[in-house]
Amino acid sequence: MNTFFLRALAVSGLMSLTTACVTSTVDEMTFNEPTEGIGDSSVVILGRRHSSDYETEPDFVACVGDHITSHDESIRVIDELEFLNAVYPWFEPRTAPLYPKNIEQLLQQKPVAEKMLALKLEYLIWLDGSTVRSDGAGSMACSFNGCFGFGTWSHDANYEATIWDFTDQAEVGQVNTSASGQSYMPAVIIPIPIIAPVQGAACDGIGDQLLEFLSSEY
């Protein structure tokens, strides 16, 4: 039996035993929850952008919003970019309010107050965090015959959602979620990535908790 076949057989067996796995945890602290949902009011979910080189991933922000609306279509989640354009420049990194006490000062700007009224904005949810990839292990070699080898790496996701009540101008809750997972890339001629859905697990975890706060159905 030639070496090519033995190596292919060994890695094929490893592929059959390998699945990406994810572990996640969620912590919640909320108060003054709406008892019957938010009615015809709206909510906006924004990623924190502390500087030009740091921002919560826009795709994660969109994922959380989609999770909420897909489970309760009665909740109106304003698109992040739509909101930022509507209230420009008041929510740019240098001008965005950092604390609920800044809401009163923000609403003193007539264009902002009028826009918030038109949007029927009840809750603003800040998302802060990121998903990072750690150093991997393993090796892989490729030639005209294909690729052989095995690689692995991990992802860690940590996010915090802070809920502001625009009417009461107060913080009414926080949700923290963390997730970690191991991804793999076995290769028998063709590399086949087996990706751990770490960011997706974090999105589902934080989205479920926000649904419990916002929706009358949960």
What are these regions (language model features)?
Residues 96-167:
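Surface-exposed short loop/turn segments
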Residues 56, 60, 64, 108-112, ...:
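Stable alpha-helical elements in mature extracytoplasmic
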Residues 21-102, 214-218:
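A structural "domain/chain start" motif
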Residues 1-19:
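Sec-dependent bacterial lipoprotein signal peptides
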Residues 22, 64, 141-148, 204:
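Sequence contexts marking disulfide-bonded cysteines in secreted/extracellular proteins
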Residues 21-41, 50, 118-119, 131-134, ...:
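C-terminal/domain-edge helix-coil "capping" segments
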